[in-house]
Amino acid sequence: MATKGTKRSYEQMETDGERQNATEIRASVGKMIGGIGRFYIQMCTELKLSDYEGRLIQNSLTIERMVLSAFDERRNKYLEEHPSAGKDPKKTGGPIYRRVDGKWMRELILYDKEEIRRIWRQANNGDDATAGLTHMMIWHSNLNDATYQRTRALVRTGMDPRMCSLMQGSTLPRRSGAAGAAVKGVGTMVMELIRMIKRGINDRNFWRGENGRRTRIAYERMCNILKGKFQTAAQRAMVDQVRESRNPGNAEFEDLIFLARSALILRGSVAHKSCLPACVYGPAVASGYDFEREGYSLVGIDPFRLLQNSQVYSLIRPNENPAHKSQLVWMACHSAAFEDLRVSSFIRGTKVVPRGKLSTRGVQIASNENMETMESSTLELRSRYWAIRTRSGGNTNQQRASSGQISIQPTFSVQRNLPFDRPTIMAAFTGNTEGRTSDMRTEIIRLMESARPEDVSFQGRGVFELSDEKAASPIVPSFDMSNEGSYFFGDNAEEYDN
């Protein structure tokens, strides 16, 4: 870990703040949430949505996407310079669903980006409020993480699909800032770096000239983000090697794959935040709740509290199970796609099942789907307990490895043994220990071999009753470690396609 003095809390990253005390952080995060809520209320008014329609998660996603697109400067510039047929670069829109004569109807809306920007700024006291935009990006990213597997993307970059637990935040745009970087998994960073290295191998000019200099700066910055996620000296030294390489190529590619695999046991620090859809914040603001005055945290009890008192609806396709749709959204809300299902089940108070057993597709409805047969139902997003979200991935006991499972990345700071399939993981480490990183590789393998599942990943942390807002009396659950705890285990989830 970097020294405590240099680490900013998520909330500071979230609000681009200087060092702030806890109260100031809670206030600035609250301000951000309040801004999203006010924007959402205004959009619902503009679109003349009923209360029920405004609480429909599909409408929320469209409205969130419109404002993100309105502020996507690079893409807007690109669209203006490369006009494509039938696409107005100055407009943004999407499907809005309305209840008409007892049926759901889809209406495609189109707005001037300028108008959306005006409404957003007005809701945020005239500021661009980038933190609020990033917050919505992270919510979309968490929803993607819970909905799709990235098998194809993993295989394309030469990684093993079983490493999916390292892929948190893989659909986050690069422009998501420090808050976005904090929630990206080790695999996501490795994948971004490998893509750069591959381009460099195929395109002689990639690292050259003025553009190449900028590319190089981006490459080193990504390496530094990755380095900050590792908790052992050997892993970090290896990232330094990758960063310092004059001409990144196959050796760096190999090192990165090795590092990604090592993270299955020597887990990296990846932030988790509960980012909720705008249709949760809007009604709360409308009911008179003042987020800035009351303060808010993305990693404490607040999101759980908010969800206890929220009504959110979703469109349901004919053969989908509403309870399963609820589980998908619950996991997305708490950034729990890669958490051990036993931990999630305990906190939620109902059994959380693996992705392959869910009878539900994603939340978004494609434009060619038949609306005639669409129903809607309430999403059950409440929980039995709450727990603090983690940013650490577990203790590495005195630089000894803490143990992972071939696919979990803890979301909640809850004491548990982490079962992991050492033979499967270690099988990936036979062979290649020569080359300039051989001593680091040897050390990393030694650390992994000495990792024991008994090394609990969070000493003494537990879950809390929803009435216990100060986290005073932890309840340490005991888990049945005999069965499989990963969400994408033996799975057939859909692939994510941009």
From Swiss-Prot:
Read off the InterPro entries from this record: Flu_NP
| Molecular function per GO | RNA binding; structural molecule activity
Keywords, alphabetical = Capsid protein, Helical capsid protein, Host nucleus, Host-virus interaction, Ribonucleoprotein, RNA-binding, Viral nucleoprotein, Viral penetration into host nucleus, Virion, Virus entry into host cell
The cellular location(s) given in this protein's UniProt record come to: Virion; Host nucleus
How does the record describe the protein's post-translational processing? Late in virus-infected cells, may be cleaved from a 56-kDa protein to a 53-kDa protein by a cellular caspase. This cleavage might be a marker for the onset of apoptosis in infected cells or have a specific function in virus host interaction.
Motif Unconventional nuclear localization signal per record, residues: 1-18
Source superkingdom? Viruses
Which GO biological-process labels does this protein carry? negative stranded viral RNA replication; symbiont entry into host cell; viral penetration into host nucleus
Where does this chain carry the motif Bipartite nuclear localization signal? 198-216
Similarity section: Belongs to the influenza viruses nucleoprotein family.
What quaternary structure, including any partners, is listed in this protein's UniProt entry?
Homomultimerizes to form the nucleocapsid. May bind host exportin-1/XPO1. Binds to viral genomic RNA. Protein-RNA contacts are mediated by a combination of electrostatic interactions between positively charged residues and the phosphate backbone and planar interactions between aromatic side chains and bases.
Q: What is this protein called?
A: Nucleoprotein
Source organism per entry reads: Influenza A virus (strain A/Wilson-Smith/1933 H1N1) (Influenza A virus (strain A/WS/1933 H1N1))
Gene behind the chain: NP
